[in-house]
Regions:
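Carbohydrate-associated surface elements
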Residues: 151, 169
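Conserved catalytic-core segment of nucleotide-activated headgroup transferases in glycan assembly
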Residues: 11-26, 36, 171-177, 182-253
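Membrane-proximal helix-turn-helix segments that form the acceptor-binding/catalytic region
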Residues: 65-78, 90-108, 114-116, 125-145
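A short, well-ordered alpha-helix in the C-terminal region of glycosyltransferases
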Residues: 318, 325-340, 346-352
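Short acidic alpha-helix that forms the nucleotide-activated donor recognition element
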Residues: 137-140, 244-255, 280, 298
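Short hydrophobic beta-strand element within catalytic cores of glycosyltransferases
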Residues: 277-280, 284-287
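Acidic donor-binding loop of glycosyltransferase active sites
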Residues: 79, 143, 251-270, 283-284
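Conserved acidic donor-binding segment of nucleotide-sugar-dependent glycosyltransferases
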Residues: 298-310, 318-324
Length: 361
């Protein structure tokens, strides 16, 4: 069975990597032939969120646009299109409409509230060109929809009866605790945040309480993916470049993970993935009590949820000062991921969805 997977982003983007690419070995073992065609090249993906370079971005985007329309010349070779988010990052769903008109079914997969407009300093121009209304149309004409959490699933069910909630998962044989998890660095615990330029503002929001904690506790703040130099007065900061090659190591070199979000619908559309990655590596997490975080984390059992600066401060303080608590959360968090957020559990479900969608008229 031949499947064309379309994604706006390459594997350097977590969504393509963990919603699509990580399943390819399993799917190929079970009779699928998967071709992944991202819209952005890795080079353009690195360029697009940088400041300036407007002429270079526009010229490259037009070239990518022409290349994307070329997909339609070969669409009849495939039994199914697996659409992650969108075929083209902006504008109406012209590629998707053309695919459906050619009689090739689509399975639509989304893991963010892309039906809402989300604007940050890092994506202001790209966001202004987004067409949020297209999501409902794509959901409506897709053969099946895979939604990353129940909030997204509820939205999709307004336009389709064929919706399955499929959480974002990790390969638990790859994301696993380091052997010396209980060994403490000489400068105290490492508190880690790993994200992207579009999510860095969330960690900036908890900067004041991190500064206050640094007056009472010895720790180092590790930041990766901010997209700009990071400095918090009074807080020792290690700013580490992100790369696919060192991704697991980045999580594993943290002793406490932080996953702050705002309490809004955009955050409710998130799939808790950074919490999942930390917990898979046995890193105890403090996360905002928003959306799917409430399902992943059982407060006080396998991690902490925080709803206010005071709760963030209290719960981070407990983890910084209590090695036994960190150890308990490490074990319980890892168990949660093994049981509910491992690709070994979701891979057969995704295979069944793709196969059934291709064969259902």
């Amino acid at each position: 069975m031949k499947v064309l997977a379309l994604s706006p982003i390459p594997e350097e983007g977590a969504g393509c990597r963990f919603r699509v690419s990580q399943y390819i070995p399993y799917l190929e073992e079970h009779g699928f032939e998967i071709t992944v065609l991202p819209f952005y090249t890795p080079e353009f993906f690195r360029l697009v969120y940088q400041r300036g370079h407007f002429a270079a971005k526009a010229a490259a985007f037009l070239q990518l646009l022409v290349k994307r329309f070329g997909v339609l010349r070969q669409i009849d070779r495939y039994d199914l299109v697996w659409l992650y988010r969108e075929a083209i990052p902006i504008g109406p769903p012209v590629i998707e409409r053309a695919i459906v008109r050619r009689g090739v079914p689509i399975v639509f997969d989304f893991d963010d509230a892309i039906f809402l407009r989300n604007v940050s300093e890092a994506n202001r121009i790209v966001s202004s060109l987004k067409n949020t209304r297209r999501v409902a149309e794509i959901v409506g004409f897709s053969r099946h929809v895979m939604a990353g959490n129940s909030f997204l699933g509820d939205y999709a069910r307004r336009f389709s009866a064929n919706v399955t909630v499929v959480p974002t998962t990790v390969d638990t044989t790859r994301f696993r605790p380091r052997a010396d998890r209980d060994t403490m660095p000489p400068d105290g615990p490492v508190v880690g945040w790993i994200g992207s330029p579009t999510t860095y503002h969330y960690v900036e929001a908890i900067a004041p309480l991190l500064k206050a904690l640094a007056l009472r506790h010895r720790f180092t703040l590790k930041i990766s993916g901010a997209g700009k130099p990071v400095h918090f007065d009074g807080v020792p900061v290690i700013d580490v470049p992100w790369s696919m090659a060192n991704e697991v190591e980045l999580f594993n070199t943290c002793d406490v993970g932080v996953y702050p979000l705002e309490d809004d619908d955009w955050a409710r559309g998130k799939c808790g993935f950074k919490a999942i990655q930390f917990m898979a590596c046995g890193v105890p997490v403090v996360a905002s009590a928003v959306g799917v975080n409430r399902e992943i984390i059982r407060d006080g059992e396998n991690g902490f949820l925080a709803s206010s600066p005071a709760e963030w401060t209290t719960k981070l303080e407990r983890l910084l000062s209590d090695a036994d608590l960190r150890r308990r959360f490490s074990i319980a968090g890892r168990h949660t991921i093994e049981q509910h957020y491992s690709l070994h559990g979701t891979a057969p479900e995704i295979a069944a969805i793709l196969r059934n969608a291709a064969h259902r008229s």
